[in-house]
């Protein structure tokens, strides 16, 4: 066998082995979250645009009731949780072993919607307001904003009606004067039926990390590099969302994933992204926004004391400027 033939055979064998070798399996990341809505555009886009795939991540979400999301994480049934920041912070103050590793939504993209005869928040004195529960963060934020207007909790009555759909229906039926918090699509339905926007919360609340990604101490110990890649994909997704050139494609993605028509999708995108800048933080921890959440929770006695925001965050996921 000549040297040239032997070399050819060796190269061919190497090529065969390379072609036969399996690709590196993607790292599976399991996550608990509430039912998917416009507040989940970051993960929707990360899936649809391949940002998770680019980071070699197989994303597996499990949807459940809001109060179960953090419980699933602490029980060890998922790797991380996407939750209202308040749920995770409350759990942490009660001994839960979990940390914030990033932001999911920034600001508070809700509106106070009232009957058409009411023109300002002051008009709600003596009225019944549709709320979630006494310990709900939506109730806490509403009371704080009303207090800023000089309207104490004793001046109105909050009824524990339920979630956005139930609050919307309570306003539509005339059962209450207003809903303390509505977001797409229910705010649009109320407005289209002649109800009045009494407050865009973003006019009062400039900075709050409303939603967060949480990891358990166990997950952080066992799969930190994977979680870093996960948050990098989320950051890429938010940057993509915030680029105006992608608006039309984002609307199409929303239509497909949220099962809504083009008009609602376009209005929702405008409300969530350019108007409320809900994904402006690009997945990073927002110290100012966390401090505001801590202030609200302590004010309403949902946590026992006002601890430093660093207490709730894994230091490895802090933005460089905050370290």
Protein language model features and the residues they cover:
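Pocket-lining segment of extracytoplasmic ligand-binding domains
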Residues: 87, 165-258
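Signal peptide processing junction and immediate N-terminal pro/mature segment
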Residues: 22-24
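Short, glycine-/small- and polar/acidic-enriched structural segments
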Residues: 26-163, 167-173, 177-184, 197-207
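Conserved C-terminal helix/tail region of periplasmic/extracytoplasmic solute-binding proteins
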Residues: 291-323
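Secondary-structure end/capping motifs
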Residues: 221-302
């Amino acid at each position: 066998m000549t040297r040239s033939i032997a070399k050819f055979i060796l190269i061919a064998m190497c090529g065969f082995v390379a072609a036969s070798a399996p690709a590196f399996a993607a790292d599976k990341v399991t996550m608990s979250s509430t039912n998917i809505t416009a507040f989940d555009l970051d993960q929707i886009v990360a899936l649809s645009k391949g940002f998770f795939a680019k980071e070699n991540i197989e994303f597996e979400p499990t949807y459940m009731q809001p109060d179960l999301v953090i419980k699933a994480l602490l029980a060890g049934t998922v790797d991380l949780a996407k939750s209202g920041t308040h749920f995770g912070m409350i759990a942490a103050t009660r001994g839960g072993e979990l940390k914030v590793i990033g932001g999911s939504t920034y600001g508070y993209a809700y509106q106070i919607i009232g009957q058409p005869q009411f023109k300002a928040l002051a008009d709600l004195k003596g009225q019944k307001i549709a709320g979630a529960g006494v310990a709900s963060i939506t109730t806490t934020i509403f009371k704080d904003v009303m207090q800023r207007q000089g309207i104490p909790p004793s001046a109105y009555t909050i009824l524990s009606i339920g979630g956005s759909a139930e609050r919307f229906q309570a306003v539509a039926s005339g059962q209450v004067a207003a809903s303390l918090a509505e977001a797409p699509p229910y705010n649009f339905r109320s407005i289209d039926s002649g109800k009045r926007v009494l407050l865009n919360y973003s006019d009062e609340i400039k900075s709050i990390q409303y939603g967060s990604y949480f990891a358990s101490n166990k997950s952080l110990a066992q799969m930190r590099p994977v979680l870093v890649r996960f948050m990098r994909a989320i950051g890429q997704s938010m940057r993509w969302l915030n680029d105006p050139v992608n608006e039309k494609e984002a609307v199409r993605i929303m239509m497909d994933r949220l099962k809504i028509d083009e008009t609602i999708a376009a209005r929702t995108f405008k409300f969530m992204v350019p108007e409320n800048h809900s994904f402006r933080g690009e997945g990073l921890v927002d110290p100012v926004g966390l401090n505001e959440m801590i202030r609200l929770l302590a004010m309403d006695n949902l946590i026992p004391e006002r601890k430093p925001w660093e207490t709730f965050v894994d230091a490895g996921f802090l933005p460089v400027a905050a370290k």
